[in-house]
Swiss-Prot record:
This is Lipoyl synthase. InterPro entries: Aldolase_TIM (IPR013785), Elp3/MiaA/NifB-like_rSAM (IPR006638), Lipoyl_synth (IPR003698), rSAM (IPR007197). SUPFAM superfamilies: Radical SAM enzymes. Signal peptide: none annotated. Pathway: Protein modification; protein lipoylation via endogenous pathway; protein N(6)-(lipoyl)lysine from octanoyl-[acyl-carrier-protein]: step 2/2. Binds 2 [4Fe-4S] clusters per subunit. One cluster is coordinated with 3 cysteines and an exchangeable S-adenosyl-L-methionine. Residues 73-289 form the Radical SAM core domain.
Length: 319
């Protein structure tokens, strides 16, 4: 049997994606010239990695194999992934380890706050694995982490990228009550691709989640993103834009899907930079306050700079 070994853990024999091991290889086309990243070798990268490891934390930058890790960590920007490194879902696009997670670490909020202080982060992004095994999906842990960072770093703005809290009544309200500055929940793809790409989620549940955030606290910026290159059609991407605007989402990100391993969903095509520029123009015309659309766009990439632009755009629209 083919086993996908863990390339993040120090244990090289632990299967990272056991549910994908028996799948046939899915071959993607060769990457075009515009998909290029620099190897992470700088001093800043090493310092960031040291602080992350010193505090026993996980980052989505490493676990998901983000192509922008070298650039972000060189600037001491890291996205902390809370509630462990093991996800209860098995999405076809994602490189995060899957399986049954362990118990939550009650000290993790304090560790995140301390790492935020050491890195000197002015804008922090916190994400998590899905924790369908928990009664509240991890909502209380999210809220505790936000509060810990607020106490340790009162001037740091906080952006969260959450799971969908599917069938977790009251969970969203707990997270929103902690008052993050930005609430991000990614749709990931168009509705027609959910069964093959994101089978554990429900598209319109995610739309409703984002809409509910605005109902609970209109001052919180909302954000969502999708990947392209998974077999979607252009008109479907435009429909996603309309659905997000109907939920009053402020910020849209669109990036190129890149295949983590041959056992993951294949890249169906590489969307050109001109097509991304067209999506960005259209999204602004539909009313988003902020749009980032490019081959290398990821949810947390340039998040701090984008937050400043987001605030400025809201202020300008209010005048």
């Amino acid at each position: 049997m083919v086993v996908l070994v863990d390339t993040v853990s120090a244990n090289p024999v632990r299967p990272r994606h056991p549910e994908k091991a028996a799948r046939p290889d899915a071959l993607s086309p060769k990457k075009p010239d515009w998909i290029r990243v620099r190897a992470p070798t700088t001093r800043g990268y090493g310092e960031t990695r040291g602080i992350v490891k010193e505090n026993g934390l996980h980052t989505v930058c490493e676990e998901a194999g983000c192509p922008n890790i070298g650039e972000c960590w060189d600037k001491k920007h890291a996205t902390f992934m809370i509630m462990g490194d093991t996800c209860t879902r098995a999405c076809a696009f994602c490189n995060v380890k899957t399986g049954m997670p362990g118990a939550l670490d009650a000290n993790e909020p304090a560790y995140v706050a301390e790492a935020t202080r050491k890195l000197g982060l002015q804008h922090l992004v916190i994400t998590s694995v899905d924790r369908d095994d928990l009664a509240d999906g991890g909502a209380a842990h999210f809220a505790a982490t936000i509060r810990a960072v607020r106490e340790a770093c009162p001037t740091t703005t906080i952006e969260i990228l959450t799971p969908d809290f599917l069938r977790k009544d009251g969970a969203l309200e707990v997270v929103v009550a902690a008052k993050p500055d930005v609430f991000n929940h990614n749709l990931e793809t168009v509705p027609s691709r959910y069964l093959s790409v994101r089978p554990g989620a429900r598209y319109f549940h995610s739309i409703r989640l984002l809409q509910r955030v605005k109902e609970l606290d209109p001052s919180i910026f909302t954000k969502s993103g999708i990947m392209v290159g998974l077999g979607e059609e252009r008109h479907e991407v435009l429909q996603v834009m309309d659905d997000l605007r109907s939920a009053e989402v402020d910020f849209l990100t669109i990036g190129q899907y890149l295949q983590p391993t041959r056992k993951h969903h294949a890249v169906m095509r590489y969307v050109t930079p001109d097509e991304f520029a067209g999506y960005q123009t259209t999204a602004y015309a539909k009313g988003f306050l902020m749009v980032s659309a490019s081959p290398m766009t990821r949810s947390s990439h340039h998040a701090g700079d984008d937050f400043a632009k987001l605030k400025a755009a809201r202020a300008a629209r209010a005048r």
